[in-house]
């Protein structure tokens, strides 16, 4: 039993992973990314101060917007092998970029690069505030409504 047509949504590095997956999965009929980098290796700047630990221990903890994540050396090494911009350029389906101007983790220029590389139909939902996590409830509600509208219109 397979899956029917679906929409795919990813946030931050998960957005880059969603783009890479959608470029291979024909059941993905529409997609959106929130605060996604245009290059998977973008995460390297988040390793400042942790690279020695990553090399010597094979793993390191990084903190993004107050949340701690464990990364393994193999994961970081693999990042350089993925072409996110090439994958988004190859998508032949609707794509929505969501990004906040004040995102300090993944700069809005990353979202602009994704949008520029994407084929039509495409949309850029840009918010003056919201940060990387859209932590303010009203910002999150507005962004969620926009993404749901996108999927309703494109699926």
Regions found by a protein language model. Give the residues of each.
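Short beta-strand/loop motif that positions the catalytic acidic residue
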Residues: 91-92, 97-99, 103
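Catalytic histidine neighborhood in serine/cysteine hydrolases
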Residues: 118-133
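Hydrolase active-site cap/lid region
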Residues: 24-74
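Short alpha-helix in the alpha/beta-hydrolase fold that links the catalytic acid
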Residues: 93, 107-116
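Gly/Ala-rich beta-loop-alpha elbow adjacent to hydrolase catalytic centers
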Residues: 10-14, 18
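Alpha/beta-hydrolase fold nucleophile elbow
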Residues: 2-10
């Amino acid at each position: 039993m397979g899956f029917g047509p679906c929409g795919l949504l990813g946030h931050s590095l998960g957005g880059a992973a969603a783009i890479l997956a959608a470029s291979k999965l024909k059941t993905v009929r529409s997609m959106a990314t929130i605060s996604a980098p245009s290059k998977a290796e973008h995460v390297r700047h988040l390793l400042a101060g942790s690279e020695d630990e990553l090399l010597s221990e094979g793993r390191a903890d990084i903190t993004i917007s107050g949340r701690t994540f464990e990364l393994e050396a193999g994961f970081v090494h693999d990042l350089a092998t993925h072409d996110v911009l090439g994958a988004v350029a190859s998508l032949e389906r609707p794509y929505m970029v969501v990004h906040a101007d004040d995102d300090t983790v993944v700069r809005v220029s990353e979202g602009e690069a994704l949008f520029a590389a994407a084929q039509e139909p495409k949309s850029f939902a840009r918010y003056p505030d919201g940060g990387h996590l859209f932590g303010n409830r009203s910002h999150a509600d507005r962004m969620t409504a926009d993404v749901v509208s996108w999927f309703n219109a494109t699926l």
